Curated annotation (Swiss-Prot):
Organism in which the protein naturally occurs: Mycoplasma mycoides subsp. mycoides SC (strain CCUG 32753 / NCTC 10114 / PG1)
Gene3D superfamilies: Ribosomal protein L11, C-terminal domain (1.10.10.250), Ribosomal protein L11/L12, N-terminal domain (3.30.1550.10)
Disulfide bridge positions per record: none
Name of the protein described by the UniProt record: Large ribosomal subunit protein uL11
A GO CC annotation given for this chain: cytosolic large ribosomal subunit
GO BP term, example: translation
Keyword Ribonucleoprotein attached: yes
Length: 142
C-alpha cells in the first residue's frame, strides 16, 4: 500500500545549513534525518540558497527534491550587489554581461519553463531588468 501524502512544502535553506525549526516542525517529519540528508546533498553548493520541495508522509517519512538556486540570488552574486533597485525603472544598481546571463540560464534550464537557451536567457534578462541590473551586449541578442 502506498504511503499517504500529508503535505508538500516549498522551502529555501542555505546549502549545508538546514536546521530543525518551525518550518520543518509544521511538516511533521523526522527533522534530524531531513537536516542530515539535506546538508549532505548540498555539500557542493556551499554558500548558495537552495530551494527544496519536501513531500511529507503520514508515517513521518519524507522525500525531497532540490531545485536550482533562485535567479535573483545568482544575479546578485554575479553583479556583486546586496539587493536590487528599489525602483528598477529609474535606478540601475549594476551591470552584467550577456555571457553572465547565458551561464545563469544554462544552470537554470532544468527548472525554467523554456525550450531553448535563448528563451531561458530572456527570462533571466527580465529578472535582471526588474532588479535594476543593466545587461550589456544586448545588441548581439535577438
Amino acid at each position: 500500500m502506498a504511503k499517504k501524502i500529508t503535505r508538500v512544502a516549498k522551502l529555501e535553506f542555505m546549502a549545508m545549513q538546514a536546521k530543525p525549526g518551525a518550518e520543518l516542525a509544521s511538516l511533521g517529519i523526522n527533522m534530524p534525518a531531513f537536516t542530515r540528508e539535506f546538508n549532505d546533498a548540498t555539500k557542493d553548493r556551499a554558500g548558495d540558497v537552495v530551494p527544496v520541495v519536501i513531500t511529507a508522509y503520514d508515517d513521518k517519512s519524507f522525500d525531497f527534491v532540490l531545485k536550482t538556486t533562485p535567479t535573483a540570488y545568482m544575479l546578485k552574486k554575479v553583479a556583486k550587489i546586496e539587493k536590487g533597485a528599489s525602483n528598477s525603472r529609474t535606478q540601475t544598481v549594476a551591470t552584467v554581461t550577456l555571457d553572465d546571463i547565458r551561464s545563469i540560464a544554462e544552470y537554470k534550464m532544468p527548472d525554467l519553463n523554456a525550450n531553448t537557451i535563448e528563451a531561458a536567457m530572456k527570462q533571466v534578462i527580465g529578472t535582471a531588468k526588474n532588479m535594476g541590473i543593466k545587461v550589456t551586449g544586448m545588441e548581439d541578442f535577438k
